């Protein structure tokens, strides 16, 4: 085929589908891997930022609570001193234990602040002063705790107002600065986490948009180089299945879809050529068989006329025999001459009987010819039907065409039967010609014999006055026999001409059947598809380039 159409296609139509799909799937996997990696990274980063923010909040809370716990411990120690004054020893112990626990909680919160993972130079400078004031605060709380255990309420009050409050104020001032720094850092970490989360969301949106764009591009590419060519191929197959072989060629690429389109186009051309050849042969066979049918019908009619003439001849011979018998009864006085005339007449009767038998053989042969021509007519009719079926099966065959092979086998079988019938017709025609020649010779002999009889009868005319009328009747009967024989001769000659025409039509039928067989042999099928194994059976169907 011409490669120009495929050269007008785009580059994508020449890419093989396996590498193309591999690239598409690879791109999807890469995009999925990148998206998963980015999502994992941003999730990990968000978790880390969240833990940092949580840690800063816990550090800030622990640092802020260290002052609150110390203040609560001071209140509990004052309450313990008050309980000791009224001899509430259990209440005093509970308050002292609560105060000691709160001092420990304050120290734990402060140690959490001291052990924070991230420290800036500003934090370290502030930590020195903060640590000094916190330790001074804790140290100042020890005498007050001792006073509380001893039940010295006045000493507790004096120590708290004179020593602890200034320490609390000093610690609170530096504590607020540290808490403010921690709050600022927590806010910064929260903002950073928010920015990273937003950046991760933007990356995910970008990845989704990229995936959507790649999906759209992939769909457009697949629609252009896979879906649309497959739709065209499906439409071509549907039209071929419906019997439409008039579609024009379309451009095809060098990939798998392109090769499929080219093979479909080649199959269409090959199928079109085969169907055209079969159709032409079928039409010619139909015309030839029509001529054979018409000729055979005419031959049958003429054969019927010939049979009627033979029947008329037989009736005339019966009348002639009766007349001769009557003349014999009236010719007793001329026995010798009548005897000789009887002998001659007997010889003539035998000759005429031979003629009758010969004509009977001709009639039998004619009947056989009629039967054979009827067979030819039936075969021609069946051949026409099978040829039409072959055209239909060829249209439905697709790539396999199994049913078409069966029709082709039947067409070859019927063609062989037509050829055999034609040969039998030729043999019978030859036999008819021979019998006709023999009949002609016997008729000539009968004529000579009858001439002798006429001479003998003339010599005794003066004796056979009484049988003149009977002799006239005999003469008229013989004339009718002669006319009937002459008519049969003409009909036989006409039958011979018709048989020759039938033979020519049979030869033409054989040639067309041979052409039809050659056209069908283009298809190579499996062994089980036909009764006789064709050439190249078992091989895949190959399409010729159109």
UniProtKB/Swiss-Prot annotation:
The modification Glutamate methyl ester (Gln) is found at residues 312, 319. It is a multi-pass membrane protein. Residues 281-510 form the Methyl-accepting transducer domain. GO terms for molecular function: protein homodimerization activity; transmembrane signaling receptor activity. SUPFAM superfamilies: Aspartate receptor, ligand-binding domain (SSF47170), Methyl-accepting chemotaxis protein (MCP) signaling domain (SSF58104). Its main location: membrane. Belongs to the methyl-accepting chemotaxis (MCP) protein family. PANTHER family: METHYL-ACCEPTING CHEMOTAXIS PROTEIN III, PROTEIN ICFG. This is Methyl-accepting chemotaxis protein III. It comes from Escherichia coli (strain K12). The lineage of its organism: Bacteria, Pseudomonadati, Pseudomonadota, Gammaproteobacteria, Enterobacterales. The gene is trg.
């Amino acid at each position: 085929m011409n490669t120009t159409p495929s050269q007008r296609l785009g580059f994508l139509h020449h890419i093989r589908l396996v590498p193309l799909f591999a690239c598409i799937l690879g791109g999807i996997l890469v995009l999925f891997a990148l998206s998963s990696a980015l999502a994992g990274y941003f999730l990990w980063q968000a978790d880390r930022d969240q833990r940092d923010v949580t840690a800063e909040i816990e550090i800030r809370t622990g640092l802020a609570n260290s002052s609150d716990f110390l203040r609560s411990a001071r209140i509990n120690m004052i309450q313990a001193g008050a309980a000791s004054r009224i001899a509430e020893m259990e209440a005093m112990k509970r308050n002292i234990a609560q105060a000691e626990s709160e001092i420990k909680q304050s120290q734990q919160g402060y140690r959490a602040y001291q052990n924070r993972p991230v420290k800036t130079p500003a934090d370290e400078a502030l930590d020195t002063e903060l640590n000094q004031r916190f330790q001074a605060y804790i140290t100042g709380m020890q005498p007050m705790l001792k006073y509380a255990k001893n039940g010295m309420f006045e000493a507790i009050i004096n120590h708290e107002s004179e020593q602890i409050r200034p320490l609390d104020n000093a610690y609170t001032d530096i504590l607020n600065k540290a808490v403010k720094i921690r709050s600022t850092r927590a806010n910064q970490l929260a903002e950073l986490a928010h920015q990273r989360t937003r950046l991760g969301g933007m990356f995910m949106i970008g990845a989704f948009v990229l995936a959507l764009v790649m999906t759209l591009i992939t769909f457009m590419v697949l629609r252009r180089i896979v879906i649309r060519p497959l739709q065209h191929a499906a439409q071509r197959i549907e039209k071929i299945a419906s019997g439409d072989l008039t579609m024009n060629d379309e451009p095809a690429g060098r990939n798998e879809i392109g090769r499929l389109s080219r093979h479909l186009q080649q199959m269409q051309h090959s199928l079109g050529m085969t169907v055209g050849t079969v159709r032409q042969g079928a039409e010619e066979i139909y015309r030839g068989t029509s001529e054979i049918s018409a000729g055979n019908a005419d031959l049958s009619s003429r054969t019927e006329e010939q049979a009627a003439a033979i029947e008329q001849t037989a009736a005339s011979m019966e009348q002639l025999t009766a007349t001769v018998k009557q003349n014999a009864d009236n010719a007793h006085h001329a026995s010798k001459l009548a005897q000789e005339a009887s002998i001659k007449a007997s010889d003539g009767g035998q000759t005429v009987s031979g003629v009758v038998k010969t004509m009977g053989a001709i009639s039998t042969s004619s009947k056989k010819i009629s039967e054979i021509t009827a067979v030819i007519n039936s075969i021609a009719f069946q051949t026409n039907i099978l040829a039409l079926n072959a055209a239909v099966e060829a249209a439905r065959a697709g790539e396999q065409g199994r049913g078409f092979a069966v029709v082709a086998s039947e067409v070859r079988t019927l063609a062989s039967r037509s050829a055999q019938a034609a040969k039998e017709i030729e043999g019978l025609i030859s036999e008819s010609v021979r019998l006709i020649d023999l009949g002609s010779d016997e008729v000539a002999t009968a004529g000579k014999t009858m001439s002798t009889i006429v001479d003998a009868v003339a010599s005794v005319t003066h004796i056979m006055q009484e049988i003149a009328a009977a002799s006239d009747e005999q003469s008229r009967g013989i004339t009718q026999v002669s006319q009937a024989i002459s008519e049969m001769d003409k009909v036989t000659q006409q039958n011979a001409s018709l048989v020759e025409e039938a033979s020519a039509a049979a030869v033409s039928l054989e040639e067309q059947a041979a052409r039809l067989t050659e056209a069908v042999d283009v298809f190579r099928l499996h062994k089980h598809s036909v009764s006789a194994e064709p050439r190249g059976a078992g091989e895949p169907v190959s399409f010729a380039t159109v």
